Swiss-Prot record:
It comes from Mus musculus (Mouse). This is T-cell immunoglobulin and mucin domain-containing protein 4. Belongs to the immunoglobulin superfamily. TIM family. It is a single-pass type I membrane protein. One of its GO terms (cellular component) is membrane.
């Protein structure tokens, strides 16, 4: 009787374990319209023995409810839609499910079931997915107001180079001087007109000035004057409240003379600087050469003096021996004389 009760109790316990799925549950929060990955890993994965499936809803007693995806241990063999995929390496047990382009219907509970051979050995994992709206942050807008600058129109910009060309030819020859002065006087009388209707008259007069200037003979002096005039155009432009009034010939000549004098002063200063540098270099070279010669002579004199001293030192002991021999001879001679006197 006791054995029957024991067997009945074991059967009921096994049936209860079979009916109650032992599955863990995680919660994943995602955002609508963005991909979401539901984690699932199995460390003891075997390519030949294990397989797995993903389903919608909690894990049942066997297989997966509303199966979304299934693998055979190495690769995906079936899937419900292309939005469900496994980005990990299936052969190493990385079977996390990735859902792309999520919507509200994708929220809920998902089951990851890893099938292991044997009774009650399947690994079950429930993952709850909660989808929310992505928070949108407004970018700060910066408004920049355009700055308006007043534009002042001048009515006589084209007469300036023509009048300057007539004055530049003055120092070349004597006959064209009369033409240039007359043309300049007429230009001065017509410059103050600032109405738009006077453009035609001014342009015709400007063309007349250019034709008169073309009749003048071209030479090297005229070309040089043209080069200087291009730098003086900025000086001749009208400034102040009366933009139409041109400067007089005396002002032009004074400006040209000041420019030429300033250029000549700059050239002279540059030439003086160059000459001073050259003279300094020449003097330094000469001084260095003289010092080298003096050092060479001193070295030679020192060698001669040392040689003479050495010779004198070598000759001194010979002189002493000679002097000793002479003194001995003199002493012997005196002894002989004393002996003769004694005899």
């Amino acid at each position: 009787m006791s054995k029957g009760l024991l067997l009945l109790w074991l059967v009921t316990e096994l049936w209860w374990l079979y009916l109650t799925p032992a599955a863990s549950e995680d919660t994943i929060i995602g955002f609508l319209g963005q991909p979401v990955t539901l984690p699932c890993h199995y460390l003891s994965w075997s390519q030949s023995r294990n397989s797995m499936c993903w389903g919608k809803g909690s894990c049942p007693n066997s297989k997966c409810n509303a199966e979304l995806l299934r693998t055979d241990g190495t690769r995906i063999i079936s899937r419900k839609s292309t939005k469900y995929t496994l980005l990990g390496k299936v052969q190493f047990g990385e079977v996390s499910l990735t859902i792309s382009n999520t919507n509200r219907g994708d929220s809920g509970v998902y089951c990851c079931r890893i099938e292991v051979p044997g009774w009650f050995n399947d690994v079950k994992k429930n993952v709850r997915l909660e989808l929310r709206r992505a928070t949108t942050t407004k970018k700060p807008t910066t408004t920049t107001r355009p700055t308006t600058t007043p534009y002042v129109t001048t009515t006589t910009p084209e007469l300036l180079p023509t009048t300057v060309m007539t004055t530049s030819v003055l120092p070349t020859t004597t006959p064209p001087q009369t033409l240039a002065t007359t043309a300049f006087s007429t230009a001065v009388t017509t410059c103050p007109s600032t109405t738009p209707g006077s453009f035609s008259q001014e342009t015709t007069k400007g063309s007349a000035f250019t034709t008169e200037s073309e009749t003048l003979p071209a030479s090297n002096h005229s070309q040089r004057s043209m080069m200087t005039i291009s730098t003086d155009i900025a000086v001749l432009r009208p400034t102040g409240s009366n933009p139409g009034i041109l400067p007089s010939t005396s002002q032009l000549t004074t400006q040209k003379t000041t420019l030429t004098t300033s250029e000549s002063l700059q050239k002279t200063t540059k030439s003086h600087q160059i000459n001073s540098r050259q003279t300094i270099l020449i003097i330094a070279c000469c001084v260095g050469f003289v010092l080298m010669v003096l050092l060479f002579l001193a070295f030679l004199l020192r060698g001669k003096v040392t040689g003479a001293n050495c010779l004198q030192r070598h000759k001194r002991p010979d002189n002493t021996e000679d002097s000793d021999s002479v003194l001995n001879d003199m002493s012997h001679g005196r002894d002989d004389e004393d002996g003769i006197f004694t005899l």
